[in-house]
Amino acid sequence: AEFCLSYSGYKGITPLMDNGHYHPTEMVSDKISSLLLFNEKIALHITRAVRWDSDHVVIFDDETKEIAKEIVRNDALDRVFIATDYFDASINRISAWVSGVRSVQKALLFALLQPDERLKQLQNENNFTEIMYLQEEMKTAPIGDVWSEYLERENVPADYLTEVKKYEQEVLVKRI
């Protein structure tokens, strides 16, 4: 990773981080703030790091949420290119794509709902007890209600799987 990051810096090109290609204890989310200090823009290939076969479809997991929080906390929504992985040999590709994109959108929404200004203030005050308390409280914040409202306002059905199955039966089955 260090070679590729150094090379992109040397050549003045946008670095790409693929969170599916790091050691299991190494997190891309930990690298974002440092990369943003030295790069005008960065690119992320968000995937699910499964270290066998396929099944890389992005889900609303801890690392995806942490990546989104780093982007939002660094006020870098306009500086980070986000791509998702939807390769999976065992499930419908359309469903995998929609699920992955929605998971990233949910993670960004979750990050945008965090009380970042309050957390920064507490950090500056060395009030780590309240930081921990607030972070724990936010884990159960009603993101589902906000997500449902977002889908409704965008006129997007919450249940995309019905449409995917219909497409699968009417279109995809004819391709076999």
Regions found by a protein language model. Name each.
Residues L5-M17, H23-I176:
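Histidine-acidic metal/acid-base catalytic patches
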Residues A1:
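Basic- and aromatic-lined ligand-binding clefts that recognize polyanionic substrates
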